[in-house]
Amino acid sequence: MMKDKLIREECGERLDDLQCDGLYLIQNPDKFCFGIDAVLLSNFVKVKKDGYAVDLCTGSGIVPILLSTKTKAKKITGIEIQSDIADMASRSVSYNKLDEKIDIINDDISNALKYIKHSCVDTVCVNPPYMKDMAAIKNPDLPLAIARHELLTDLESVINIANKLLKENGRFFMIHRPSRLSEIFASMRQNRIEPKRIRFIHSYIDSKANLVLIEGLKGSGVWLDVEPPLAVYKEKNVYTDEVLKIYGR
């Protein structure tokens, strides 16, 4: 298939340069475009050489596509419930000629074991909906509401399926809101995933954290490393040097 046939401009789609090893992503601004949280997550994730990684709630496929160059994973699977978003992700994979390395599954993450064997995954990562179904005002646009609110999945379901997919000593990575950290830790432990590493993300170094990166290890003992905080901006609309480095600039 010709590359220009993969982008449906008549439907509002565009091709975005990820400025990372010549990678591109097909997106539709009328649906949901990736944010800095996906970029930070992909930079935080670790996959062993020739390992198998699964990205839950993959959306546009941004995390698998970035992991294809940021890690030495042999195989990466993204799972996305919204069919039109999953289709865009699949076409982005094809545009970047990554079909042999990345596959996109269009289904509910609760059905992951229909496609992936139990306890066979080295790394599971996820940038899930942050807000509970009844929390905050839902976006009237359904694709955006699904991406932001726990309408079709929830925190417990995400961590439960991660446990089922992971090998013993497999790694789990998540980005979420600090306000839900106690819930996250409780659910991880209930599912035998011990929190191992966290890093708080701040808009500015002197502001409250608004995101947190979390790493867990399945079946591990108890210890936790809190990394130095990451500030996104040094002044209004100006990224810090570390964030610029993450973006490859």
What are the residue ranges of the model-derived segments?
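Conserved SAM/SAH cofactor-binding pocket of Class I
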Residues: 44-137
